């Protein structure tokens, strides 16, 4: 009997032992940092878990068998790995994740001046990494922004191709451009603030659509673009990115990291762009796009200090020689009336820095300064401008219970001088010198785990216009981990400088009339934002973000092109202006590596005066963007298909006889790129831009009016100053460069390579 009992115990023990289950554990990281809240699961089973705050995970009691482990985390590429589970085996499996352009968990600073996860911020901030911009390589960030929903680079001149950035249909001057959070990009230099920074040195770009005046001052009326440069500590030892197009546009980006002693790290960047081909495919005798010779040097230092306190300082210098005009123009014709040309020399220097004061409290001193010199000739019209801006700010960051406080004092000095009437008084030179001291306070209150309220107030004193008060309120409701609602509202105040903001005021093609003493513009804005995250069991991720926005302007300054075709009349609107609409972005990440980013904006912009509503020139009502990417793993080839589409825009005509179309057509700019990454440290890429070969001249006899007589020597006027139609001038036109809404560059190929040594 004892033998039978012993045998039964032995059999039961061995049966239980053979059925003993095993475990799977490990560490999920990215760039040597743990990734929290990543989903770890065995596909097709009930075994699933999430990583903790340090990136660790563990799944227990797994039965024997073959499984496929999948890791899914917001903002990172999905990973899969086959495993075989055997009895009585504890498997340790670590994963290293790579970033994707879905950056919902990205840390942002632009919304509140504090480093916070994007999903935790009460202010909606869009984040774009270099991965996003590499899908359609460009020579400047200005051009790259054409792939961002609701953001449109707008050319302002068909000859020299200067432009600005429109956010949600608002003109460029309503957008504040920052570098590392510093407002060093002035109205004279918006385009140059987005040119000359090597893409390899950009950590990310943050975009806030809507009011940000309570933190950044009165210029942030329509939104802001904050270019965050790399921390030298995390930058690669050496990086290079070189590409050229079939138009022989050549761009070179170089970056080098240097360790100086034991406590300092420097990052040196060089950007060089050259295009010197006088191409005239539209046969109007003028260059299709402007020629440019631009070089930019950038250096950033970071210093190691006690208690991990911050100290960074950066400097940048830019020089550009830009030309557009008659293909027969030479340097000797600059400023003369034999052959028309627009020649712009630009010199620019910038200095920015942040220093955390050595106190127990978190006190941050930030400073920036820039000088910008522009020497231009628009035909015989000379425009020579000099602008200097200094900025100093001290902030105190303090948490008290449920209150996360940020308060600060700031002062900004703006010196502006040019050779126009804008800076002359009684026949003598009178440079514009503006002081703008201010104080602000912001309190982000955590009402509950799911509800946050942000209150902000800023007071500035403009030495010309007196007191400026800009309040702000934001509310965030986190319904759950996958659904977030934000409501933001605020006001704005902006002083306009016509000669730095409106290129048409400089060309000399039309006479400038300022009807009255222009008052500063004021605005009030509201924005409702909703984020939805959808995670599927198979690893598919869908992110949806929708915003409703409304801005109402008073004292808006409008340009009247219609009253007199030979004049531009500027005046404050006798009424109000509205900018409103809806914008949606949708991200798709599929387990097979397919990624789709798409967005669309429906815009309604109107000037309301004396009960009459008018849509401003060059303002689209609908725009959409997309990016489709797929990597063929077997051959290390990545395919990127990007594009955008714009609805018709009203365009300025010179007269009733003007044969050009009063509206632009629906048009789309589409691109494709192939990137090979099979060699260590190297990437080779090639593709085609403007696949549909769209050109704005399509269905138009010409774009630039009277290129055969740019100095209007053969124009005949009546006694009232109106242009007469003559056999030589059958449409009664004068020389005009303002009829431009898109790039005048057709289909073209490109090829480039990248080298990165970490």
Question: Positions of the model-derived regions?
Answer:
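Short, acidic, small-residue-rich periplasmic hinge/interaction motif at the N-terminus
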Residues: 27-33, 37-43, 72-76, 86, ...
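Short acidic/polar hinge/loop motifs at secondary-structure boundaries
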Residues: 60-61, 166, 182-209, 297, ...
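N-terminal periplasmic accessory domains that precede
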Residues: 91-95, 141-144, 163-166, 192-198, ...
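Extracytoplasmic beta-strand/coil segments of soluble accessory domains associated
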Residues: 142-183, 203
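Membrane-embedded beta-barrel scaffold of Gram-negative outer-membrane proteins
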Residues: 263, 364-376, 478, 486, ...
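Flexible loop and strand-edge segments within Gram-negative outer membrane beta-barrel domains
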Residues: 275-296, 302-363, 369-388
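Gram-negative outer-membrane beta-barrel transporters
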Residues: 446-450, 543-552, 572-653, 754-756
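C-terminal beta-signal and adjacent terminal beta-strands/loops
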Residues: 645-652, 676-758
């Amino acid at each position: 009997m004892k033998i039978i009992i012993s045998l039964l115990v032995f059999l039961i023990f061995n049966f239980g032992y053979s059925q003993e289950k095993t475990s799977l554990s490990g560490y999920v990281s990215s760039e040597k940092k743990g990734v929290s809240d990543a989903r770890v699961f065995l596909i097709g089973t009930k075994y699933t878990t999430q990583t903790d705050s340090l990136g660790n995970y563990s799944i227990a009691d797994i039965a024997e068998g073959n499984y496929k482990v999948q890791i899914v985390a917001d903002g990172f590429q999905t990973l899969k790995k086959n495993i075989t589970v055997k009895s009585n085996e504890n498997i340790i499996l670590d994963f290293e994740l790579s970033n994707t352009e879905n950056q919902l968990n990205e840390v942002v600073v632009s919304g509140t001046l504090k480093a916070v996860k994007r999903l935790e911020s009460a202010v909606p901030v869009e984040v774009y990494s270099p991965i996003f911009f590499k899908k359609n390589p460009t020579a400047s960030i200005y051009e790259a922004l054409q792939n961002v929903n609701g953001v449109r680079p707008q050319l302002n001149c068909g000859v020299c191709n200067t432009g600005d950035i429109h956010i949600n249909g608002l003109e460029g001057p309503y957008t504040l451009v920052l570098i590392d959070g510093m407002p060093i990009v002035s109205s004279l230099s918006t385009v140059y603030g987005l040119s000359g920074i090597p893409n390899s040195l950009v950590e990310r770009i943050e975009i806030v659509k809507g009011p940000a005046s309570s933190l950044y001052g009165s210029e942030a009326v329509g939104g802001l673009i904050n270019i965050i440069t790399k921390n030298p500590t995390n930058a690669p030892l050496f990086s290079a990115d070189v590409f050229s197009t079939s138009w022989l546009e050549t761009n070179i980006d170089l970056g080098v990291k240097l360790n100086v002693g034991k406590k300092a790290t420097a990052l040196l960047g060089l950007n060089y762009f050259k295009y010197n081909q006088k191409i005239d495919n539209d046969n109007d005798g003028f260059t299709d796009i402007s020629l440019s010779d631009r070089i930019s040097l950038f250096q950033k230092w970071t210093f190691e200090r006690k208690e991990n306190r911050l100290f960074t300082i950066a400097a940048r210098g830019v020089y550009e020689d830009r030309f557009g005009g008659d293909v027969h123009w030479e340097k000797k014709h600059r400023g003369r009336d034999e052959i028309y040309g627009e020649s712009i020399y630009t010199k620019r220097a910038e200095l920015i820095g942040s220093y955390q004061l050595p106190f127990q409290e978190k006190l941050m001193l930030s400073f920036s300064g820039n000088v910008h010199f522009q020497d231009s000739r628009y035909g015989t019209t000379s425009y020579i401008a000099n602008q200097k801006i200094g900025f100093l700010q001290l902030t105190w960051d303090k948490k008290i219970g449920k209150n996360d406080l940020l308060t600060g004092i700031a002062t900004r000095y703006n010196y502006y001088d040019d050779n126009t009437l804008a800076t002359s008084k009684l026949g003598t030179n009178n440079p514009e010198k503006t002081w703008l001291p201010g104080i602000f306070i912001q309190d982000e209150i955590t009402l509950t785990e799911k509800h946050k309220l942000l209150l902000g107030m800023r007071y500035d004193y403009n030495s010309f216009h007196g007191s400026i008060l800009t309040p702000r309120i934001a509310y965030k409701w986190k319904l759950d981990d996958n659904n977030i609602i934000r409501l933001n509202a605020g006001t704005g105040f902006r002083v306009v400088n016509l000669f730095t903001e409106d290129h048409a005021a400089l060309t000399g093609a039309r006479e400038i009339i300022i009807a009255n003493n222009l008052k500063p513009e004021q605005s009030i804005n509201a924005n409702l934002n909703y984020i939805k995250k959808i995670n599927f069991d198979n690893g598919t991720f869908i992110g949806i973000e929708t915003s409703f926005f409304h801005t109402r302007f008073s004292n808006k300054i409008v340009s009247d092109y219609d009253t007199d075709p030979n004049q531009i009349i500027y005046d404050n609107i006798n009424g109000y202006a509205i900018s409103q609409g809806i914008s949606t972005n949708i991200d798709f990440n599929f387990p097979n590596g397919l990624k789709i980013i798409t967005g669309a904006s429906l815009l309604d912009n109107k000037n309301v005066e004396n009960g009459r509503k008018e849509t401003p020139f060059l303002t689209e009502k609908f725009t959409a963007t997309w990016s489709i990417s797929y990597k063929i793993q077997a051959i290390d080839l990545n395919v990127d298909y990007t594009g955008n589409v714009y609805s018709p825009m009203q365009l300025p005509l010179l007269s009733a006889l003007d044969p050009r179309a009063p509206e632009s057509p629906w048009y789309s700019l589409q691109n494709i790129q192939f990137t090979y990454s099979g060699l260590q440290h190297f990437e080779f890429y090639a593709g085609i831009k403007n696949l549909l070969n769209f050109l704005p001249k399509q269905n138009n006899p010409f774009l630039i009016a009277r290129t055969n007589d740019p100095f209007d020597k053969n124009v005949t006027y009546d006694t009232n100053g109106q242009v007469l139609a003559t056999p030589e001038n059958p449409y009664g036109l004068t020389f005009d460069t303002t009829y431009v809404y898109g790039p005048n560059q057709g289909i073209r190929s490109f090829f480039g390579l990248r080298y990165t040594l970490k």
